[in-house]
Amino acid sequence: MFKKIAADALGLSDIGKIIEPQDYDKTDADDYVMHEDNEKIYFLIKTKADEYCFTNLALIHVDGERATSSKRTLKRYPYSQYKISDVFLETAGKVDLDVEIKFKLGGEQFDIDVHKDQIEKLKDLYKALLRIAETTYENDILINQAEQSLDKAVTILHHTRPEHVNIETQYKELTEFGFTWLTSVRSQYHIKDFGDVFEKYINN
């Protein structure tokens, strides 16, 4: 009930409104942020039906079936599992009341309308999402190259193995090295926390 009253106080409609940090506690999404894991809200768009909460770890979507219903479905999209791509910002024409940011998270398409007088803030989100998408794309290439390099190294060692080397011992050593190598690469390039990107573009 309190959240509904707060939504009315924020003057919400079907067109999204960017919520200021001091009002995050008036939203439903704030209840589902994993503060215990140092998760932090960086950007929040709210309509009467939906909330789109961008944290350093994930997009939290509080999905309302319709503005007149109190029923909500909580959807969480970790950036490490749902890659951001196809980020677009559509500006307003002379008679338009809203601007629109579009992007994909994994296989999900998001089209979010925001009041056009908040376009400057929306530009910051656009830049942050675009940078995350670029970083993820580049890192996927590096991870793939690392895996291919390991495969080539294993093949070369297999064909140049001296006769006196124990096959079982060599296989064990290669397996342990490969696991350590790939774990190290994944730790470096499979990013889960994009707080530094949001800090750069949202809070700067």
Curated annotation (Swiss-Prot):
The lineage of its organism: Bacteria, Bacillati, Bacillota, Bacilli, Bacillales. SUPFAM superfamilies: PH domain-like. This is Uncharacterized protein YvbH. It comes from the Bacteria. Residues 109-136 form a coiled coil. Disulfide bonds: none annotated. It holds the Pfam family bPH_1. InterPro entries: PHb, PHb_sf, YvbH_oligomer_dom. Keywords: Coiled coil.
